Amino acid sequence: MSPQTETKASVGFKAGVKEYKLTYYTPEYETKDTDILAAFRVTPQPGVPPEEAGAAVAAESSTGTWTTVWTDGLTSLDRYKGRCYHIEPVPGEESQFIAYVAYPLDLFEEGSVTNMFTSIVGNVFGFKALAALRLEDLRIPPAYTKTFQGPPHGIQVERDKLNKYGRPLLGCTIKPKLGLSAKNYGRAVYECLRGGLDFTKDDENVNSQPFMRWRDRFLFCAEAIYKSQAETGEIKGHYLNATAGTCEEMIKRAVFARELGVPIVMHDYLTGGFTANTSLAHYCRDNGLLLHIHRAMHAVIDRQKNHGMHFRVLAKALRLSGGDHIHAGTVVGKLEGDRESTLGFVDLLRDDYVEKDRSRGIFFTQDWVSLPGVLPVASGGIHVWHMPALTEIFGDDSVLQFGGGTLGHPWGNAPGAVANRVALEACVQARNEGRDLAVEGNEIIREACKWSPELAAACEVWKEIRFNFPTIDTIDKLDPSVDKVA
């Protein structure tokens, strides 16, 4: 008899409530290559043992419920249940533990981030026995990864489409984000692109409002792209935000972008949802469009250290669902982002194989089995003085996006774009000559100012700007004696 139809009627059914740990805490379990592995930060309520808390997470996110049910005997619980297989205390934190849970692959629908998250980060996060719960990391097994298309094109294909190599790409978010007419918006796009940027961008909340309907914006931005390409001889793009109230409307906007011949569209993947995002990613691959992803709403989910979900999990989910770019913080700008943690999930976005490294917040070795990579986008409160640090931190395979750092230039948009392009080219040249950007960065920018008045003006405006606030979501100081999980 197959495990799916095997029953346990002979055992008999005994109604009542029993501790989760009797069924779902299995420290002797050896994980399988096909298991989805999760690392949860668990804060039990007073009086709840960590083993019971970890087992409750495994149960409530897989096959369990609060009481024994007779229908357990109609299936093979051992085949389908989640298992809490290891628990370790969090150093320096009182009553916090990392609970490792293994999920059998058969619990999840193929190619569906929506289904995976509905189980793993579903109702269990409201469980009363837990004071707080956070999903720190997931190990996606190759067997499950292979059921996803992933990014529409990936890093190498994007570079080939743009014919741009050996440096980060430059972008700019058009400001003010709301209120411009479509024609004025297109004018701002044109000035930035002709000044030397590779991309400009719709802000995440630019959809189709009364002051600027989406079709008008698409037309004026396409005009700006073609005019700037003709003047500069470079391929240009603008992230046309296709996010809409329905999936049908979203695809309609993407179809119009394709008909205009532009290279890239955009989606807000968390507010739009993973089902919509995956649908759009499939359309983009089939029709030659790059897909830029904004992470609006992520901080609602990932900002607090003891509850929610770390962004590295959202980044992995996006790579599965599909996107060629995703915003990833800056480390040096106005938005939250610990350096080591950021570099950890940047590698998870770009690389094919990433080793476990708890010093960077990576709990599991991740093999992407040739799934295309995603370009991290550094955006938020950055300007020309940050260029050396950004080039050193993110490397060539990234997009550096300056909104106010372009449009806030005292001479206008095009000079602002020139300043950023000159600063980037100076940093790349200095790096290629063997100079240390972390040490000599400011000097490299000052030298470039001598032959670029646009850069000199930008440096003068932003010389005093700092965002020196402590990072909330930092990596735990690990005690090597407790980290025994591969």
Swiss-Prot record:
Q: How is it modified after translation?
A: The disulfide bond which can form in the large chain dimeric partners within the hexadecamer appears to be associated with oxidative stress and protein turnover.
**Names of the cofactor(s):** Mg(2+)
Which residues hold substrate? Answer: 123, 173, 177, 295, 327, 379
Record's keyword annotation contains Translocase: no
Q: Which GO terms describe its cellular component?
A: chloroplast
Cofactor stoichiometry and binding? Binds 1 Mg(2+) ion per subunit.
Give the function comment from the record: RuBisCO catalyzes two reactions: the carboxylation of D-ribulose 1,5-bisphosphate, the primary event in carbon dioxide fixation, as well as the oxidative fragmentation of the pentose substrate in the photorespiration process. Both reactions occur simultaneously and in competition at the same active site.
Q: What is this protein called?
A: Ribulose bisphosphate carboxylase large chain
Instruction: Identify the taxonomic lineage of the organism of origin.
Output: Eukaryota, Viridiplantae, Streptophyta, Embryophyta, Tracheophyta
